[in-house]
């Protein structure tokens, strides 16, 4: 659970707004907003029926953004994601018909149920910020955010994302089942209708884009950068790790921390930000040795072990 600290007035409203729909998932709402602020993307892994789709819809509605959904299936084609060129007999020219990737907030539902080729079409668009169809390049919407969902790998009919593709996601999150009381609240909220239907924007899309630009003005001093690098480099030296976190992971953790600091109405990063975010930012970028997997060792546990061994820089601390 995140440490207790006041949120940015505007962004705090969005968090509470999402929490009206997603009972008991405040931390997931905060992390999703942080990823969107950092211009990153989120991979949400969990069993069906825990509210992954509602989370993305609530996020989109809270900032007045255009929401698109892609339901990934084994027969989905790359053009079903990126769009196609259609011949117009009247103009005798080909016209681009946009795919769902052209939305602001895109739900890539069950991404591990489609072929690697179609997965790549989405992931390359996420990386480049554009799509190319028949030689023509189209820029993606601004803001642009993908929340991809996947079922756990033990489910049948899945195509696991390779490590190089997982690296494209800022965070990998799990929602989990609600508690007894939370599930009671869900039933009460949906007794007559779903609260998502009456959700209104609390931040204008243009204001959110401005806040995204403000993230780069959040300071991460040298001690914070050294702290990040030391943690990341130790993932490459750990005996259970076959492939450690790349420099892209270091950058991702710093950007995530800057966004998280802004969300908490600060213009500087503190060690608490790194400690809280590292378990969501680093483990999915690591490949463990087969014997470590066989022994049940988890990448997240390795990250926590490393953080417990790395000296924390002395800085201003958040109020807990």
From Swiss-Prot:
SUPFAM superfamilies assigned: P-loop containing nucleoside triphosphate hydrolases
GO MF, one term, reads: ATP binding
Locate the residues binding ATP: 46-53
Gene3D superfamilies xrefs: Magnesium chelatase subunit I, C-Terminal domain, P-loop containing nucleotide triphosphate hydrolases
Q: Cite the Pfam families for this sequence.
A: AAA_3, AAA_lid_2
Q: What is this protein called?
A: Uncharacterized protein YeaC
**Keywords, comma-separated and alphabetical:** ATP-binding, Nucleotide-binding
Tell me which family the UniProt entry assigns to this protein. Answer: Belongs to the MoxR family.
Note the CDD domains from the entry.
AAA
Q: Which InterPro entries match?
A: ATPase_AAA-3, CbbQ/NirQ/NorQ/GpvN, ChlI/MoxR_AAA_lid, P-loop_NTPase
Signal sequence coordinates? none
């Amino acid at each position: 659970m995140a440490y207790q600290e006041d949120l940015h007035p505007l962004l705090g409203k969005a968090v509470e707004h999402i929490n009206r729909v997603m009972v008991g998932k405040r931390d997931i709402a905060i992390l999703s907003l942080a990823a969107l602020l950092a211009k990153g993307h989120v991979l949400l892994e969990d069993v069906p029926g825990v509210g992954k789709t509602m989370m993305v819809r609530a996020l989109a509605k809270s900032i007045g953004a255009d929401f698109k959904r892609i339901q990934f299936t084994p027969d989905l084609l790359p053009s079903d994601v990126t769009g196609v060129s259609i011949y117009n007999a009247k103009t005798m020219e080909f016209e681009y018909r946009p795919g769902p990737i052209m939305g602001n907030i895109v739900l890539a539902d069950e991404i591990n149920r489609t072929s690697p080729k179609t997965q790549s079409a989405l992931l390359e668009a996420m990386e480049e910020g554009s799509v190319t169809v028949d030689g023509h390049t189209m820029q993606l919407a601004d803001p642009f955010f993908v929340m991809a969902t996947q079922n756990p790998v033990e489910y049948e009919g899945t195509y696991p994302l390779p490590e190089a593709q997982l690296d494209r996601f800022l965070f990998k999150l799990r929602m989990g089942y609600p508690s007894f009381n939370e599930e009671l609240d869900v039933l009460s909220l949906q007794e007559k209708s779903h609260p998502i239907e009456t959700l209104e924007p609390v931040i204008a899309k243009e204001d959110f884009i401005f806040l995204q630009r403000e993230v780069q003005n959040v300071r991460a001093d040298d001690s914070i950068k050294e702290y990040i690098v030391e943690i990341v480099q130790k993932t490459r030296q750990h005996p259970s790790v076959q492939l450690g976190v790349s420099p892209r992971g270091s950058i991702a953790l710093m950007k995530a921390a800057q966004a998280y600091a802004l969300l908490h109405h600060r213009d500087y990063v503190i060690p608490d930000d790194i400690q809280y975010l590292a378990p969501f930012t680093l483990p999915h970028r690591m490949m463990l040795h087969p014997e470590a997997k066989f022994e049940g060792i988890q990448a997240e546990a390795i990250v926590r072990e490393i953080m417990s061994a790395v000296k924390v820089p002395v800085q201003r601390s958040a109020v807990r």
